[in-house]
């Protein structure tokens, strides 16, 4: 993950998304400078991050004074106004911040940000919505992680016909074109990573499977 390699972050815009990113990065042990023009937003995270400052990031002199150039990565969480987030992104790139990650609200917004040099653009609301919909559409699914458009990892309850079968007998790879990478015993049980061929599936188990999205969907429908 990009966040593990880098150690110092500037987070600009402390709405729900920005403040969540700032506090989480801080709790993971990174140095975080949090910036917002609203004093109440800054106060909300002040105790939880390394530095919290009230300032207008649209003004390049403010960013220079804060020394943002010395940070590994900037997260622009000002998603509601294309003009503001574009201007801030441009400022950061011109000042020389190595990596700039931006939040966008739409595909048009994303295109604008990529054109002016954003290294990565995320759609938090859209991504959460997609994950929620995938979870709701299958009552079996406990968790779904999209690795790319075509591949994913899913944790799903095992179908009845798998009970008391060994992983070898199930031959999941040949039958369903997915790989079982772990099994969780019982609802809150321990995760058995890379279970052996002789592992017996029991009622209440959940499997963590890796594969193409279409094959994973088929597995969930069992």
List PLM regions with ranges.
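Cytosolic regulatory regions of ion transport systems
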Residues: 1-222
